[in-house]
């Protein structure tokens, strides 16, 4: 083959939930013969360097690397070290959303550096996060196709699009009144509270308008999903929303072996082998895994309800508590745990404070259910592992993903969340207990388990040679080759 090697730049937004799937994508394209370069800032480069080096050791003939872009926080009016969402999540002040907005708008500082690098390297394509709408203009200026990466499902993108076009929330009595999203396959019922509608007159609303406009003028969209999972919505999206969309996921399946699965994000707060040994001692399908994503810190009152609910369910569990370091202590002094909780549940439950090797855990045969916030990375990792889920959406587009799990795929049990977590309504211990019992051993548990297992097999088939996602990678690379 005399074709020039394809070179793709990957530019993730600086947050773990955005960096991890684009790292997976960079590895996927490297495995398919492309040269992959990840663009990021100094602090985030340190997070990506270790998994990239490990990947290169295992695959010395493949090309993958990092280009560091300067991001002078203090000069931009940000606190020292404010280079990713982790910093903002740990920022213990009431104006943390204002800091997030300032951080978001400050990323445009990298525009000139991006353009210089594109000009110098002349890559085949730029895959840039949706949070960088200005990247479309940068790529266009130099004649390089810009692909958008949203990091969510086609289903959620279709829901958002139709909410914006039809504005059904304007036609109901209140923000908690349910309505059907018009024009979509199936009856998707939601409320304005759950849809997390952005006021278009606010700075954030105006930013989203820029995001949509940049997508319209971009070359296309790369979706971390697989066609069979949401075919009606993938077709709808290609017909009405995006000119071109390639479904190339689940991206988490581009990780092979224990070390690669364990090394995707930050260093885990538990020894992987110790965790696997604990799981090996449990009956298949008997453990429920709870994790609410890297960006969700729940109040102590809610953690207490979860603890009582778990204990009441009688199930084995692994519970990942992702709170800020100054909020989570160790041992029995923690005021978010019932007195004597860990002692009473020794052998039955495992609490991981901080970061967990999630894909490694979900893939273990002992796991029988996953309690999730319905962030798309976690949702798709649960689907790829063939697991039924307890859905507990908290913000962003998570209520849409919940509808996909509970109403379309029918592999989810709703814990009872009806509005965004920031509104402060607690889920009770009784609700937690009921949902956990139901997902593991309820009346419809077996039916749900079989459907989830089938979807897991379909996910794995999609990324194998001849599968739908494998073929979409081919089609995308052929399209890039055709542009030369």
Curated annotation (Swiss-Prot):
Under which main EC class is this enzyme filed? transferase
InterPro entries given for it? UDP_glucos_trans, UDP_glycos_trans_CS
Which GO molecular function terms does the record list?
Answer: flavonol 3-O-glucosyltransferase activity; quercetin 3-O-glucosyltransferase activity; quercetin 7-O-glucosyltransferase activity; UDP-glucosyltransferase activity
Q: Which reaction does it catalyse?
A: a flavonol + UDP-alpha-D-glucose = a flavonol 3-O-beta-D-glucoside + UDP + H(+)
Glycosyltransferase found in the keyword field:
yes
Cite the binding residues for an anthocyanidin. Answer: 18, 89, 396
What UniProt keywords apply to this chain's record, in alphabetical order? Detoxification, Glycosyltransferase, Transferase
Pfam families in the cross-refs: UDPGT (PF00201)
**In the UniProt entry, which residues are flagged as the active site?**
18 (proton acceptor), 129 (charge relay)
Q: Where does UDP-alpha-D-glucose bind?
A: 356, 358, 373, 376-378, 381, 397-398
What the entry lists under SUPFAM superfamilies is as follows:
UDP-Glycosyltransferase/glycogen phosphorylase
> Which EC number(s) are documented for this chain?
2.4.1.-, 2.4.1.91
Q: What induces it?
A: Induced by pathogen infection and salicylic acid.
What tissue specificity does the UniProt entry give?
Specifically expressed in roots.
The signal peptide stretch is none
Q: What else is known?
A: Plants overexpressing UGT73B4 show enhanced root growth in seedlings grown in presence of 2,4,6-trinitrotoluene.
Function as written in the Swiss-Prot or TrEMBL entry = Possesses quercetin 3-O-glucosyltransferase and low 7-O-glucosyltransferase activities in vitro. Also active in vitro on benzoates and benzoate derivatives. Can detoxify the explosive 2,4,6-trinitrotoluene in plant by forming O- or C-glucose conjugates.
Q: Would you identify the family this protein belongs to, as annotated? A: Belongs to the UDP-glycosyltransferase family.
Please identify the protein, giving its name as recorded.
UDP-glycosyltransferase 73B4
Species annotation? Arabidopsis thaliana
């Amino acid at each position: 083959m005399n074709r020039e090697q394809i070179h793709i730049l990957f530019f993730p937004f600086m947050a773990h939930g955005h960096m991890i799937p684009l790292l997976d994508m960079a590895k996927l394209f490297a495995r398919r013969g492309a040269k992959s370069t990840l663009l990021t800032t100094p602090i985030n480069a340190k997070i990506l360097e270790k998994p990239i080096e490990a990947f290169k050791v295992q695959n010395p003939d493949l090309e993958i690397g990092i280009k560091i872009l300067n991001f002078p926080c203090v000069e931009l009016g940000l606190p020292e070290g404010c280079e990713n969402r982790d910093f903002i999540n740990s920022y213990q002040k009431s104006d943390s959303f204002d800091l997030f907005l300032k951080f978001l708008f400050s990323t445009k500082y990298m525009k000139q550096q991006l353009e210089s690098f594109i000009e110098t390297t002349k890559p085949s394509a730029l895959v840039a996060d949706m949070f960088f709408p200005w990247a479309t203009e940068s790529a266009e200026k130099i004649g390089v196709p810009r692909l958008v990466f949203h990091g969510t499902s086609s289903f959620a993108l279709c829901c958002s699009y139709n909410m914006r076009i039809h504005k059904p929330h304007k036609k109901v009595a209140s923000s908690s009144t349910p309505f059907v999203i018009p024009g979509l396959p199936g009856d998707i019922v939601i409320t304005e509270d759950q849809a997390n509608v952005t006021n278009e007159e606010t700075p954030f609303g105006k930013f989203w308008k820029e995001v949509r406009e940049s997508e319209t003028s971009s070359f296309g969209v790369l979706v971390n999903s697989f066609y069979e999972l949401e075919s009606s919505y993938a077709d709808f999206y290609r017909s009405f929303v995006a000119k071109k969309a390639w479904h190339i996921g689940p991206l988490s399946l581009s990780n092979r072996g224990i070390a690669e699965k364990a090394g995707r994000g930050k260093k885990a707060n538990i020894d992987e082998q110790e965790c696997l040994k604990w799981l090996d001692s449990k009956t298949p399908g008997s453990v429920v895994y709870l994790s609410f994503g890297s960006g969700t810190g729940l109040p102590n009152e809610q953690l207490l309800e979860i603890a009582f609910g778990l204990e009441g369910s009688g199930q084995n569990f692994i519970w990942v508590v992702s709170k800020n370091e100054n909020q989570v202590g160790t041992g029995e002094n923690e005021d978010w745990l019932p007195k004597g909780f860990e002692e009473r549940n020794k052998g039955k439950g495992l609490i991981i404070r901080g970061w967990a090797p999630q894909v490694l855990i979900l893939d273990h045969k002992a796991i029988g259910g996953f309690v999730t916030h319905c962030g798309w990375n976690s949702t798709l990792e649960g689907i790829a592992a063939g697991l039924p889920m307890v859905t507990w959406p908290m913000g962003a587009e998570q209520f849409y993903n919940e509808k996909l799990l509970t109403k379309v795929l029918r592999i989810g049990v709703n814990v009872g969340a009806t509005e965004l977590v920031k509104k402060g309504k607690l889920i009770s211990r009784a609700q937690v207990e009921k949902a956990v019992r139901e997902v593991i051993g309820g009346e419809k548990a077996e039916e749900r388990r079989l459907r989830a297992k089938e979807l897991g097999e379909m996910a794995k088939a999609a990324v194998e040679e001849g599968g739908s996602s494998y073929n979409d990678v081919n089609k995308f690379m052929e399209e890039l080759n055709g542009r030369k």
